[in-house]
Amino acid sequence: LVNNAGYGHLGLFEQTSDADARAQFETNVFGMMDVTRAVLPVMRARRSGRVLNLSSVAGMAGFAMAGLYCASKFAVEGFSLSLAQEVKAFGIHVTVVAPGFIRTDFLDPSSYRLPDASIPDYAAMDEALRAAYLPMNHLQPGDPARLGRALVELAASESPPLRWSAGSDAVQMVDARLAELKAELDAGRALSASVDGEWA
């Protein structure tokens, strides 16, 4: 099973609505869950199966103007990592596939939703982010055909990874995020330990 349905709702969070958020999750999260729920009994009966859930680098790092999309992909990651533990005993492998920028129509106006700026305080940021994101359309470094071949290889693997980053740009972004997390973890170790109770 390859869960690949999704779209990006772009826009600064304060300029999005509750309906926008629910629509984003309906496609990117709940649709994926519904299909997975329907397929799992068949895989469980066969004691084998592969589930590849398409996330994104946006499922590990937040990006301004993509809060709803990032939130939906964080949900895909959390769901997938949890599901993997539940179904492993039945020979079912779950892999989170996290592509970087792949040369698709994702940044084409037909594929995303991007409301006009409505709050003057955000106007400059909105303009700058549009100028950064939108010109990348059809100039993304990742090759969708090569991604497809890699997914076939993952599906055929005897021991597929729990999480796989697709594209060197994805690997670089994950490396950067891991370094940030490690630095924050180290800086806050003493405060973190201060929460431990002295129960003995």
Regions found by a protein language model. Give the residues of each.
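Conserved NAD(P)H cofactor-binding loop of Rossmann-fold oxidoreductase domains
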Residues: 4-9
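Active-site-adjacent segment of SDR/Rossmann-fold oxidoreductases
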Residues: 61, 82-92
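SDR active-site lid
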Residues: 89-160
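Active-site loop immediately N-terminal to the catalytic Tyr-X3-Lys motif
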Residues: 14, 61-68
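Active-site helix of classical SDR
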Residues: 36, 72
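Substrate-binding pocket helix/loop in short-chain dehydrogenase/reductase
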Residues: 12-13, 20-22
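Residue(s) in the substrate-gating loop at a strand-loop-helix junction
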Residues: 56
